[in-house]
Amino acid sequence: MVEFEIVKGDITRFPAEAIVNAANRYLEHGGGVAYAIAKAAAGDPREYIRISKEAMREQLGKDHIEHGEVVVTPAMRLEKHGIRYVIHTVGPYCGGIWDEDKKEKLRKAILGALRKAEELGVKTIAFPAVSAGIYGCPLEEVVKTFKEVIDEFEREAGSVERVYLVLYSEKDYERALRAV
């Protein structure tokens, strides 16, 4: 059984074996949680961008990520918190508009990261609210989609035991709890 828990905290310090980065398709890590993770992992975000782009070319053979594809990079300085991997995924850009196409792209982004965690053999994985920040998707819809995808993923899960949705602000944490 895969347990899903919504928690308040800083994903860069959250003690899961893998954390997910809500990245843009070029792994630029220029703002939001992507910048915070890059800075915490490498000290210099530009260095983590270089490492991420190199990993993307090695793992995918191209210079961008599609919805559902993921890239794994080392946790580097995050290892002191028990984090072993950073899994980069790309959610949809909503700009405040939510529809079935956006939901399907988010489902692919979440499922891609979960399947990669399974492949890596990790027991715990922590996600930020992918696409709910800078990308402007409604938080409540993002949370509901997370819950649905995790319920479906449970049928294929082997090593993954716990999935966390980590919200940084108290307000978002409370909104997320009300959504499920």
From Swiss-Prot:
A Pfam family found in this protein is Macro
Task: Enumerate the InterPro entries for this protein.
Answer: Macro_dom (IPR002589), Macro_dom-like (IPR043472)
Q: Which SUPFAM superfamilies match?
A: Macro domain-like (SSF52949)
Q: Which stretches are transmembrane?
A: none
Macro domain residues are 1-180
Q: What domain of life does the native source organism fall in?
A: Archaea
Which NCBIfam families has this protein been placed in? Answer: PRK00431.1-3
What name does UniProt use for this protein?
Uncharacterized protein TK1890
